[in-house]
Regions:
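Terminal and linker regions of secretory-pathway proteins
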Residues: 2-508
Length: 508
């Protein structure tokens, strides 16, 4: 999840014609004010932007094209990736695009399981941002290899494709190698595109339709995944593939509740010492109340404006004091690795960008564009100006649970921006049919079956599980690769409670 710079926040507020926070927030007593403000603001009616392409290869003979049986305007381009050329993994791989006419093109890279690809589960992985490529997950966190300083792949023995086949989809439109005439600037639209991609994928790989299928991701995927799951389960009951479960790591799903937990995390109540002064903590605590009121207006309104202002205020009041400490927003234990101020924070992410811009890499994968960037600021800004970041998506998690579809919310406990306290809180307050039974469960130790070490804390009732992972930041697989792999292997094997399977986990 990217964060706003305070200067940008102030520019945003100035752009909506109010000279100070005080003047802006005096308007929030009555939600009807927003109806008039929408007309005054001159907010972008279409924040989507055109992407300049370096080249097109729709007619590349190395691609096989599958036309959708649902809608002939959609197709899937597919090419085999020679494992020996890039050395990311020795397993079978495919890459390509989902195309909608000539206006939308979504890039993906698919790796078979290292174990039993015919029968092992399929996992779709999504990174966040909004606007960040899922190749961050592939080449920095949980994929078959990472990229070293010498631009050569480093084998990852803890890759999630040890026991599952992995799809890495670059979405929404405009991210990474994905491109189009217009860019998507809302989670709702992104969810529709992702669902259509999945239908096409399983048309191209029909032998995998009966396999377990999971959607996993982190950060802003806490928005994406609930929306995609809603598209699958509720809006498309005639789907041709299974949805077995979803997994969200350090996500932003219920911003109203999660915003209340920035001050506790920064001020020593999340298992780490305070990083702000008592005066700053008191000021942040007061600001949290105003943030809560703004988020409530966002939740209640059909207008984007209250959500835009809620994002601007909450980020400036609850993120900026922390950012000013110089600490990494993704890991409270220290500053960014290279003392960067651009939000990248990890040198390895720069290696991924450099690697993906090598002509031989792009040629092997069949990318239509040359200018790869791990995070796209235009996409991020587009989502900002629809207020998408402050909108709620936890209701779709409840929907899944009420359909008895398992949900795992996991969180590294050293992250600040989507911290474990906030994720634990919203999952505890979620309105679903077994809320009270879930609430009565207490966090208990999660102990490794491999080493006997306590890796974190877990809480489970029925299909719903919350998992705190010790000593991991925003990107759990990066900080705790062994624990991350044990987590995903346990989950996809059906051990939703992360316990001795002889334990009666669902007793009320």
């Amino acid at each position: 999840m990217k964060y706003l710079n305070l200067v940008f926040v102030l520019q945003l507020l100035i752009s909506i014609k109010y000279a100070s926070f005080g003047r802006a927030f005096s308007l929030f007593e009555d939600d009807t004010t927003f109806a008039n403000l929408d007309k005054q603001l001159k907010l972008p009616q279409n924040t989507q932007q055109t992407l300049k392409l370096d080249r097109l290869n729709h007619d590349d003979p190395l691609f096989t094209t599958f036309i959708s049986s649902m809608d002939k305007d959609y197709s899937l381009r597919l090419r085999t990736v020679d494992p020996s050329k890039l050395g990311i993994d020795t397993v079978k791989q495919w890459s390509g695009y989902m195309d909608y006419k000539d206006s939308k093109h979504f890039f993906y890279w698919f790796f078979e399981s290292r174990n039993d690809p015919a029968d092992d589960p399929i996992i779709l992985w999504l990174n966040g941002g909004p606007g960040c490529s899922s190749f961050t997950g592939l080449l920095f966190e949980l994929g078959p290899s990472s990229i070293g300083a010498d631009m050569k792949p480093i084998h990852n023995p803890y890759s999630w494709n040890n026991n599952a086949s992995m799809i890495f989809l670059e979405q929404p439109l405009g991210v990474g190698f994905s491109y189009g005439d217009e860019k998507v600037s809302s989670t709702k639209l992104a969810g529709k595109d992702a669902y259509i991609f999945l239908e096409l994928f399983f048309e191209a790989f029909p032998h995998l339709r009966s396999n377990d299928f999971h959607i996993a991701g982190e950060s802003y995927a806490g928005h994406y995944i609930p929306q995609i799951a809603h598209e699958i389960v509720v809006k498309n009951p005639e789907r041709t593939f299974n949805l077995t479960s979803v997994m969200i790591g350090n996500g932003i799903t219920d911003p109203l509740i999660q915003a209340d937990y920035y001050e506790p995390m920064a001020c020593g109540k999340g298992g780490y010492h305070p990083v702000l002064s008592s005066e700053e903590c008191e000021k942040m605590s007061k600001a949290a109340g105003r943030c809560r009121r703004l988020n409530k207006l966002c939740y209640a309104s059909k207008s984007s404006l209250p959500c835009i202002v809620a994002t601007a205020y909450c980020d400036s009041a609850l993120l900026e004091p922390y950012i000013n400490t110089g600490l990494n927003v993704y890991d409270i234990r220290g500053p960014c690795e290279d003392n960067s101020t651009d939000g990248m924070c990890y040198t390895g992410l720069r290696y991924v960008d450099q690697y993906m811009n090598f002509p031989e890499v792009q040629e092997t994968l069949g990318s239509d564009v040359h200018n790869y960037s791990g995070c796209d600021n235009d996409v991020f800004t587009g989502f900002l100006f629809t207020g998408d970041g402050s909108k709620p998506f936890q209701q779709y998690i409840a929907e899944l649970l009420n359909h008895n579809i398992p949900v795992l919310i996991y969180a590294g406990d050293k992250d600040y921006i989507c911290n474990w306290l906030g994720n634990h809180a919203w999952s505890n307050e979620l309105e679903w049919i077994n809320k009270r039974r879930y609430q009565r469960r207490m966090l208990r130790p999660w102990v490794s079956k491999e080493t006997g070490e306590e890796l974190g804390q877990v809480k489970n009732y029925g299909p719903f599980t919350f998992l705190r992972i010790y000593d991991a930041g925003h990107m759990v697989p990066y900080d705790q690769p062994e624990a991350s792999l044990e987590m995903v292997n346990s989950w996809i094997s059906g051990n939703r409670a992360f316990s001795d399977l002889s334990t009666l986990e669902n007793a009320s």
